[in-house]
């Protein structure tokens, strides 16, 4: 496993991907995403044990602006990827794309840019093969056009799924599969963080990924983030 971690470090050194920064305060009192914030035990996105590993890195020095925040600041999304083999007894590692929104650090397991998921079985030369396959694919991903991301998010923002709280909660439970308690928590969190009611696919994906941030176990968090990505897939061209 740690050979794979070393391979990821090699990839990070050769590409633009890194451990994400985090939100800090500014002199004006506004929350600001700082890509150069020092890595701490609380902010790291590398998790591992003797048997499993989960790593999430982003290209947060090349943001994609998807609109404006209520305070007039740009609303930024960053390309990223994760590698995981945390399923019990897993005999392979996989790498797939993910996106992170700067203002809230929500993560979306979304394959809108057609990045082919890479799977590497644990064999003697797994780390070398992983680096050889993943490095060029991630470099291409990082340097690609932002059109599909922007079009996908715009489509999600335009796709209305609810007119009131009752309809939104019903959608989160019936369509997404959240429990009544989780649906209520997601709806409330979205209102608190976005300062508007949940009405669109984009709103729902942000609500889901917001409550996912509270989940300490990465596998369980990723399950919710995949649900958000699947929602976005329903409207992305």
Language model region names:
Residues 2, 7, 12-236:
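Intrinsic disorder/low-complexity polar-acidic segments
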